[in-house]
Amino acid sequence: MANYTAADVKKLRELTGAGMMDCKKALDEAEGNVEKAVEALRIKGQKGVAKREGRSAENGAVVSIIADDNSSGVLVELKCETDFVAKGEKFQNVATAIAEHVAKAAPADLDALLASEIEAGKTVQAFVDEANANLGEKIVLDRFAQFADGYVLAYMHRTMPDLPPQIGVLVELDKPNAEVAKGVAQHIAAFAPKYLSKEDVRPDVVESERRIAEETTRAEGKPEAAIAKIVEGRVNGFFKDATLLGQPYALDNKKSVQKVLDEAGVTLKRFTRIKVGI
Protein backbone atom coordinates (compact mmCIF):
# COMPACT_ATOMS: atom_id res chain seq x y z
CA MET A 1 0.00 0.00 0.00
CA ALA A 2 1.33 3.43 -0.92
CA ASN A 3 2.58 5.45 2.04
CA TYR A 4 1.82 8.81 0.43
CA THR A 5 -1.28 10.73 -0.61
CA ALA A 6 -2.57 12.34 -3.80
CA ALA A 7 -1.64 15.67 -2.21
CA ASP A 8 1.97 14.46 -1.96
CA VAL A 9 1.97 13.61 -5.67
CA LYS A 10 0.52 17.03 -6.51
CA LYS A 11 3.09 18.77 -4.33
CA LEU A 12 5.94 16.83 -5.92
CA ARG A 13 4.71 17.70 -9.41
CA GLU A 14 4.54 21.37 -8.44
CA LEU A 15 8.04 21.26 -6.95
CA THR A 16 9.70 19.45 -9.84
CA GLY A 17 7.48 19.70 -12.92
CA ALA A 18 7.88 15.94 -13.36
CA GLY A 19 5.13 13.73 -14.76
CA MET A 20 2.60 12.00 -12.49
CA MET A 21 3.97 8.48 -12.97
CA ASP A 22 7.54 9.66 -12.34
CA CYS A 23 6.39 11.35 -9.14
CA LYS A 24 4.56 8.24 -7.93
CA LYS A 25 7.58 6.07 -8.65
CA ALA A 26 9.89 8.49 -6.85
CA LEU A 27 7.60 8.56 -3.82
CA ASP A 28 7.45 4.76 -3.80
CA GLU A 29 11.23 4.57 -3.82
CA ALA A 30 11.51 7.30 -1.17
CA GLU A 31 8.90 5.58 1.03
CA GLY A 32 6.68 8.66 0.92
CA ASN A 33 9.40 11.16 1.83
CA VAL A 34 8.78 14.15 -0.46
CA GLU A 35 12.22 15.70 0.06
CA LYS A 36 13.99 12.46 -0.89
CA ALA A 37 11.67 12.10 -3.88
CA VAL A 38 12.62 15.60 -5.05
CA GLU A 39 16.30 14.70 -4.80
CA ALA A 40 15.76 11.45 -6.72
CA LEU A 41 13.89 13.23 -9.50
CA ARG A 42 16.59 15.89 -9.79
CA ILE A 43 19.25 13.20 -10.16
CA LYS A 44 17.10 11.40 -12.70
CA GLY A 45 16.54 14.70 -14.47
CA GLN A 46 20.26 15.29 -14.95
CA LYS A 47 20.59 11.84 -16.51
CA GLY A 48 17.56 12.41 -18.70
CA VAL A 49 18.61 15.69 -20.30
CA ALA A 50 20.24 14.01 -23.27
CA LYS A 51 17.18 11.79 -23.79
CA ARG A 52 14.98 14.88 -24.08
CA GLU A 53 17.05 16.48 -26.85
CA GLY A 54 14.96 14.85 -29.57
CA ARG A 55 11.62 15.83 -28.08
CA SER A 56 9.51 18.75 -29.24
CA ALA A 57 9.11 21.92 -27.15
CA GLU A 58 6.08 23.80 -28.47
CA ASN A 59 4.55 25.17 -25.26
CA GLY A 60 6.04 27.89 -23.11
CA ALA A 61 5.82 31.59 -22.38
CA VAL A 62 6.79 35.01 -23.64
CA VAL A 63 8.11 37.35 -20.94
CA SER A 64 8.65 41.11 -21.13
CA ILE A 65 10.78 43.53 -19.17
CA ILE A 66 10.19 47.26 -19.72
CA ALA A 67 12.32 50.02 -18.17
CA ASP A 68 10.48 52.28 -15.72
CA ASP A 69 10.96 55.23 -18.08
CA ASN A 70 10.05 53.17 -21.17
CA SER A 71 13.47 53.85 -22.69
CA SER A 72 14.10 50.15 -23.35
CA GLY A 73 12.32 46.82 -23.41
CA VAL A 74 12.90 43.10 -23.79
CA LEU A 75 10.90 40.09 -24.98
CA VAL A 76 12.09 36.54 -24.31
CA GLU A 77 10.48 33.31 -25.51
CA LEU A 78 11.17 30.23 -23.40
CA LYS A 79 9.68 26.96 -24.61
CA CYS A 80 8.83 23.69 -22.88
CA GLU A 81 6.96 20.51 -23.77
CA THR A 82 3.69 20.79 -21.84
CA ASP A 83 1.31 23.49 -20.66
CA PHE A 84 1.54 21.96 -17.17
CA VAL A 85 5.16 23.09 -16.91
CA ALA A 86 4.49 26.35 -18.77
CA LYS A 87 2.01 27.56 -16.16
CA GLY A 88 4.22 26.54 -13.25
CA GLU A 89 5.96 29.14 -11.12
CA LYS A 90 9.40 27.52 -11.50
CA PHE A 91 9.33 27.69 -15.30
CA GLN A 92 8.06 31.26 -15.31
CA ASN A 93 10.76 32.29 -12.83
CA VAL A 94 13.41 30.90 -15.18
CA ALA A 95 11.95 32.86 -18.10
CA THR A 96 11.78 36.07 -16.05
CA ALA A 97 15.36 35.67 -14.82
CA ILE A 98 16.58 35.32 -18.40
CA ALA A 99 14.59 38.38 -19.51
CA GLU A 100 16.02 40.44 -16.64
CA HIS A 101 19.50 39.30 -17.64
CA VAL A 102 18.92 40.32 -21.27
CA ALA A 103 17.79 43.77 -20.10
CA LYS A 104 21.04 44.23 -18.17
CA ALA A 105 23.54 42.49 -20.46
CA ALA A 106 22.15 43.59 -23.86
CA PRO A 107 23.63 40.60 -25.76
CA ALA A 108 24.22 41.09 -29.48
CA ASP A 109 22.55 37.84 -30.52
CA LEU A 110 21.38 34.46 -29.26
CA ASP A 111 24.85 32.92 -29.22
CA ALA A 112 26.14 35.81 -27.14
CA LEU A 113 23.18 35.48 -24.78
CA LEU A 114 23.66 31.74 -24.24
CA ALA A 115 27.39 32.23 -23.59
CA SER A 116 26.93 35.12 -21.14
CA GLU A 117 26.98 34.59 -17.37
CA ILE A 118 23.60 34.93 -15.72
CA GLU A 119 25.14 34.02 -12.35
CA ALA A 120 28.74 33.86 -11.21
CA GLY A 121 30.32 30.95 -13.08
CA LYS A 122 27.05 29.93 -14.76
CA THR A 123 26.18 30.71 -18.37
CA VAL A 124 22.64 31.16 -19.62
CA GLN A 125 23.02 27.86 -21.49
CA ALA A 126 23.93 26.11 -18.24
CA PHE A 127 21.01 27.86 -16.54
CA VAL A 128 18.63 26.52 -19.20
CA ASP A 129 20.15 23.03 -18.95
CA GLU A 130 19.63 23.12 -15.20
CA ALA A 131 15.97 24.02 -15.73
CA ASN A 132 15.74 21.16 -18.20
CA ALA A 133 16.91 18.76 -15.51
CA ASN A 134 14.88 20.23 -12.66
CA LEU A 135 11.61 20.44 -14.58
CA GLY A 136 11.95 17.10 -16.36
CA GLU A 137 11.18 18.55 -19.79
CA LYS A 138 13.06 19.87 -22.77
CA ILE A 139 13.49 23.62 -22.18
CA VAL A 140 14.49 25.75 -25.15
CA LEU A 141 15.62 29.37 -25.38
CA ASP A 142 15.91 30.33 -29.03
CA ARG A 143 14.50 33.83 -29.44
CA PHE A 144 14.62 37.24 -27.81
CA ALA A 145 14.28 40.90 -28.80
CA GLN A 146 15.52 44.11 -27.26
CA PHE A 147 14.72 47.73 -28.15
CA ALA A 148 16.52 50.69 -26.57
CA ASP A 149 16.29 53.67 -28.90
CA GLY A 150 12.99 55.42 -28.25
CA TYR A 151 9.73 55.04 -26.31
CA VAL A 152 9.26 51.29 -25.80
CA LEU A 153 6.12 49.48 -24.70
CA ALA A 154 5.09 45.81 -24.57
CA TYR A 155 1.71 44.17 -24.93
CA MET A 156 1.29 40.61 -23.70
CA HIS A 157 -1.61 38.39 -24.76
CA ARG A 158 -2.82 35.20 -23.08
CA THR A 159 -4.48 32.68 -25.39
CA MET A 160 -5.77 30.79 -22.32
CA PRO A 161 -6.52 32.40 -18.94
CA ASP A 162 -4.59 29.80 -16.93
CA LEU A 163 -1.45 29.99 -19.09
CA PRO A 164 1.28 32.63 -19.18
CA PRO A 165 1.33 35.00 -22.18
CA GLN A 166 1.77 33.13 -25.46
CA ILE A 167 2.09 36.26 -27.62
CA GLY A 168 4.31 39.24 -26.90
CA VAL A 169 4.63 42.46 -28.89
CA LEU A 170 7.31 45.11 -28.50
CA VAL A 171 6.85 48.51 -30.16
CA GLU A 172 9.18 51.49 -30.29
CA LEU A 173 7.94 55.04 -30.96
CA ASP A 174 10.07 58.11 -31.57
CA LYS A 175 8.37 59.92 -28.66
CA PRO A 176 6.19 59.00 -25.65
CA ASN A 177 2.55 58.14 -26.28
CA ALA A 178 1.33 55.26 -24.15
CA GLU A 179 -2.18 55.16 -25.59
CA VAL A 180 -1.07 54.90 -29.22
CA ALA A 181 1.76 52.50 -28.40
CA LYS A 182 -0.62 50.15 -26.58
CA GLY A 183 -3.26 50.32 -29.30
CA VAL A 184 -0.79 49.61 -32.09
CA ALA A 185 0.76 46.77 -30.07
CA GLN A 186 -2.69 45.22 -29.59
CA HIS A 187 -3.30 45.53 -33.33
CA ILE A 188 0.01 43.76 -34.05
CA ALA A 189 -0.85 40.97 -31.61
CA ALA A 190 -4.16 40.38 -33.39
CA PHE A 191 -3.17 40.78 -37.05
CA ALA A 192 0.47 39.61 -37.06
CA PRO A 193 1.83 41.88 -39.81
CA LYS A 194 5.14 40.68 -41.22
CA TYR A 195 6.58 44.08 -42.15
CA LEU A 196 6.38 47.69 -41.01
CA SER A 197 5.97 49.25 -44.47
CA LYS A 198 6.23 48.43 -48.19
CA GLU A 199 9.84 49.60 -48.12
CA ASP A 200 10.72 46.84 -45.64
CA VAL A 201 9.60 44.01 -47.95
CA ARG A 202 12.58 42.43 -49.70
CA PRO A 203 12.59 42.74 -53.51
CA ASP A 204 12.70 38.96 -53.95
CA VAL A 205 9.54 38.61 -51.83
CA VAL A 206 7.74 41.22 -53.94
CA GLU A 207 8.87 39.51 -57.13
CA SER A 208 7.64 36.15 -55.86
CA GLU A 209 4.23 37.62 -54.98
CA ARG A 210 4.02 39.29 -58.39
CA ARG A 211 4.85 36.01 -60.14
CA ILE A 212 2.25 34.10 -58.14
CA ALA A 213 -0.34 36.80 -58.85
CA GLU A 214 0.36 36.67 -62.58
CA GLU A 215 0.24 32.87 -62.76
CA THR A 216 -3.01 32.82 -60.77
CA THR A 217 -4.57 35.49 -62.97
CA ARG A 218 -3.63 33.67 -66.17
CA ALA A 219 -4.93 30.37 -64.76
CA GLU A 220 -8.26 32.10 -64.15
CA GLY A 221 -8.46 32.91 -67.86
CA LYS A 222 -8.54 36.68 -67.48
CA PRO A 223 -8.20 38.75 -70.68
CA GLU A 224 -4.57 39.48 -71.59
CA ALA A 225 -5.22 43.21 -71.66
CA ALA A 226 -6.44 43.15 -68.05
CA ILE A 227 -3.72 40.96 -66.55
CA ALA A 228 -1.23 43.71 -65.68
CA LYS A 229 -3.85 45.74 -63.82
CA ILE A 230 -5.20 42.70 -61.95
CA VAL A 231 -1.68 41.61 -60.97
CA GLU A 232 -0.89 45.08 -59.66
CA GLY A 233 -4.08 45.04 -57.61
CA ARG A 234 -3.19 41.69 -56.09
CA VAL A 235 0.33 42.79 -55.24
CA ASN A 236 -1.09 45.90 -53.56
CA GLY A 237 -3.45 43.59 -51.67
CA PHE A 238 -0.44 41.64 -50.45
CA PHE A 239 1.17 44.85 -49.20
CA LYS A 240 -2.03 45.80 -47.39
CA ASP A 241 -2.22 42.42 -45.65
CA ALA A 242 1.47 42.03 -44.85
CA THR A 243 2.56 45.55 -43.90
CA LEU A 244 1.46 47.17 -40.66
CA LEU A 245 1.17 50.83 -41.67
CA GLY A 246 -1.34 50.18 -44.45
CA GLN A 247 -3.66 47.95 -42.44
CA PRO A 248 -7.05 49.19 -41.15
CA TYR A 249 -6.51 49.98 -37.47
CA ALA A 250 -8.02 47.33 -35.21
CA LEU A 251 -9.53 49.88 -32.81
CA ASP A 252 -10.95 52.09 -35.60
CA ASN A 253 -11.11 50.39 -38.98
CA LYS A 254 -12.02 53.63 -40.74
CA LYS A 255 -8.40 54.67 -40.29
CA SER A 256 -5.14 53.00 -41.28
CA VAL A 257 -2.43 52.42 -38.70
CA GLN A 258 -0.39 55.09 -40.51
CA LYS A 259 -3.27 57.57 -40.14
CA VAL A 260 -3.50 56.89 -36.40
CA LEU A 261 0.22 57.51 -35.99
CA ASP A 262 0.09 60.67 -38.10
CA GLU A 263 -2.81 62.10 -36.09
CA ALA A 264 -0.89 61.44 -32.88
CA GLY A 265 2.26 63.03 -34.29
CA VAL A 266 4.43 59.98 -33.61
CA THR A 267 6.50 57.61 -35.72
CA LEU A 268 6.61 53.86 -35.18
CA LYS A 269 10.30 53.06 -35.55
CA ARG A 270 10.04 49.27 -35.31
CA PHE A 271 8.13 46.40 -33.80
CA THR A 272 8.46 42.70 -33.13
CA ARG A 273 5.88 40.02 -32.42
CA ILE A 274 6.74 36.71 -30.78
CA LYS A 275 4.27 33.85 -30.49
CA VAL A 276 5.31 30.71 -28.65
CA GLY A 277 6.32 27.97 -31.06
CA ILE A 278 5.90 30.08 -34.22
Curated annotation (Swiss-Prot):
Lineage of the species this protein comes from: Bacteria, Bacillati, Actinomycetota, Actinomycetes, Kitasatosporales
Bilayer-crossing residues are none
**Sequence segments annotated as region (Involved in Mg(2+) ion dislocation from EF-Tu):** 82-85
Cellular component per GO, a single term = cytoplasm
What are the protein's GO molecular function terms? translation elongation factor activity
Which gene underlies this protein? tsf
Protein task: Associates with the EF-Tu.GDP complex and induces the exchange of GDP to GTP. It remains bound to the aminoacyl-tRNA.EF-Tu.GTP complex up to the GTP hydrolysis stage on the ribosome.
Q: Which Pfam families match?
A: EF_TS
Q: Which family does it belong to?
A: Belongs to the EF-Ts family.
**Where is this protein chiefly located?**
cytoplasm
Q: Where is the signal peptide?
A: none
Q: Which UniProt keywords apply?
A: Cytoplasm, Elongation factor, Protein biosynthesis
Protein name in the entry: Elongation factor Ts
For this protein, the record's InterPro entries field holds: EF-Ts_dimer_sf, Transl_elong_EFTs/EF1B, Transl_elong_EFTs/EF1B_dimer, Transl_elong_Ts_CS, UBA-like_sf
Entry's PANTHER family?
ELONGATION FACTOR TS, ELONGATION FACTOR TS, MITOCHONDRIAL
The record's subcellular locations are: Cytoplasm
